[in-house]
């Protein structure tokens, strides 16, 4: 069902102002659990390949019409979890803002986790994003390390993480 109570029409595209999104995945070894590791499922062998896209259509607000496409991968093999995603995003301003430019961005991440003990998982992640658009310099890169401890019998997980935020291609560095 669609909530039509407050739906407006886009001034630019003359269609309902909504987030239109879709995702297509291929899981050749059965359904991939939506977990980044689970101590109760340490004998899994799953893999996922995906493609996603979305268009966010704004109405008369002084905002943007955004388009995003992405590729994803995830794998769960016994004690090991791996995942990666890459995406492209285009931000186009609405006519009301009187800005004729649009901006394109690239980003992505890779992450992994490994159970070193029955309830203790070590994890690492690396994010990258060109926050000034593909036409200008200015990348953020954020490496992170962490650990997850899963308590027995209560569906509770304790997480600890250290993340460093760095940038390059800017006039000043962090």
Feature map (PLM): residue ranges:
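Outer-membrane beta-barrel "beta-signal"
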Residues: 19-31, 147-151, 156, 170-174
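Outer membrane beta-barrel transmembrane domains
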Residues: 113, 117-163
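Surface loops at the rim/top face of extracytoplasmic beta-rich domains
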Residues: 7-19
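Short acidic/polar capping segments at secondary-structure boundaries
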Residues: 2-8, 29, 56
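Outer-membrane beta-barrel and related beta-rich outer-membrane complex signature
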Residues: 10-12, 96-98, 136
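A short, acidic, flexible beta-alpha connecting loop/helix-capping segment that sits on the rim
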Residues: 5, 70, 162-168
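Detector for outer-membrane/organellar transmembrane beta-barrel domains
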Residues: 23-132
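Residues that define the transmembrane beta-barrel architecture of outer-membrane proteins
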Residues: 16-20, 65-69, 102-108, 139-143, ...
């Amino acid at each position: 069902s669609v909530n039509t109570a407050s739906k407006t029409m886009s001034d630019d595209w003359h269609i309902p102002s909504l987030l239109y999104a879709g995702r297509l995945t291929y899981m050749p070894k059965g359904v991939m659990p939506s977990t980044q590791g689970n101590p109760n499922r340490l004998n899994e062998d799953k893999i996922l390949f995906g493609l996603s896209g979305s268009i966010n259509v704004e109405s008369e607000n002084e905002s943007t019409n955004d388009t995003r496409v992405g590729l994803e991968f995830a794998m769960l093999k016994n004690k090991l979890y791996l995942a990666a995603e890459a995406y492209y995003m285009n931000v186009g301003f609405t006519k009301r803002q009187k800005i004729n430019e649009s901006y394109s961005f690239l980003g992505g991440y890779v992450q992994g986790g490994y159970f070193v003990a029955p309830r203790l998982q070590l994890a690492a992640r690396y994010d990258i994003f060109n926050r000034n658009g593909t036409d200008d310099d200015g990348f953020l890169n954020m490496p992170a390390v962490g650990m997850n401890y899963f308590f027995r019998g209560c569906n509770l997980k304790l997480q600890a993480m250290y993340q460093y935020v760095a940038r390059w291609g800017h006039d000043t560095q962090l």
